[in-house]
Regions:
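A short, N-terminal "cap"/entry segment at the start of jelly-roll beta-barrel domains
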Residues: 1-44, 48-51, 57-58, 140-147
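A general structural-boundary detector
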Residues: 37, 55, 77, 106, ...
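Short, charged N-terminal helix-start/capping segments
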Residues: 1-14, 50-58, 90-108, 151-168
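N-proximal short alpha-helices
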Residues: 23, 33-37, 41-44, 59, ...
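N-terminal regulatory/effector-sensing and dimerization cores
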Residues: 40-137
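Amphipathic alpha-helical segments enriched in hydrophobic/aromatic residues interleaved with Lys/Arg
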Residues: 4-20, 126-183, 187-188, 193-201
Length: 202
């Protein structure tokens, strides 16, 4: 019986992963259609920046504010000091302080461009959500790294997709964008990156 349960769980995880990947590709295509040939677009949605590259890039340094970064298509690498990170569309990463990073796009082409998003995180919103949700206290020693990587779940991706889809309904952005961003932050707080995000509010 235990084997059957394990097989069922693995099958469900595989179905969820396949669904997320297909949905990501569809969302990446919509973003490419909206932003055209621009490599970086500060969108009409507050705090949201979209990225698109048609070819790999050289390492480039810049300052990243407290944010969550998600790749919808492609592969990128980030360096901070002696630490290197490589992540793709199955994961996201979070920073809680301003960080001087070196970023490089590793996989991108005209037919399958690199597509990603950066959502700046708001300190006051996080603090209020921590109070409202009554999340358990942090364990000491957690969230010690400057960058935390997390697995992208179906509910979290669903919220991200709803946020980006608001670009097609600009009249809805002022009302719905704050609500969807609040959901995204709440779902991030309940992931393995929750301790890192809580640091923003302290």
């Amino acid at each position: 019986m235990a084997v059957d349960v394990l097989a069922s769980e693995e099958s469900e995880e595989s179905i969820t992963a396949d669904w997320i990947m297909k949905s990501m590709k569809a969302l990446a295509s919509r973003i490419v259609g909206q932003i055209g040939d621009e490599t970086e677009v500060v969108s009409e949605i507050p705090n949201l920046t979209l990225h698109r590259f048609d070819e790999p890039t050289k390492p480039t340094g810049y300052l990243l504010e407290p944010s969550v970064c998600v790749i919808l298509q492609g592969l990128s690498a980030w360096s901070l000091g002696d630490n290197d990170y490589v992540y793709d569309a199955t994961r996201f990463f979070v920073t809680s302080i301003d960080l001087p990073l070196i970023a490089q796009i590793l996989e991108a082409s005209p037919s399958e461009p690199y597509v990603g998003m950066t959502l700046k995180l708001d300190r006051m919103q996080i603090a209020q959500l921590i109070l409202d949700s009554q999340l358990p206290s942090l364990n000491s020693g957690k969230a010690s790294r400057a960058i935390e990587l997390g697995a992208l779940s179906k509910p979290l991706f669903g919220a991200i997709e709803r946020l980006i889809n608001l670009l097609a309904e600009p009249e809805c952005i002022p009302v719905l964008s704050p609500l969807v961003q609040k959901e995204i932050v709440f779902r991030l707080l309940t992931t393995e990156c929750g301790p890192k995000i809580r640091q923003i509010a302290t």
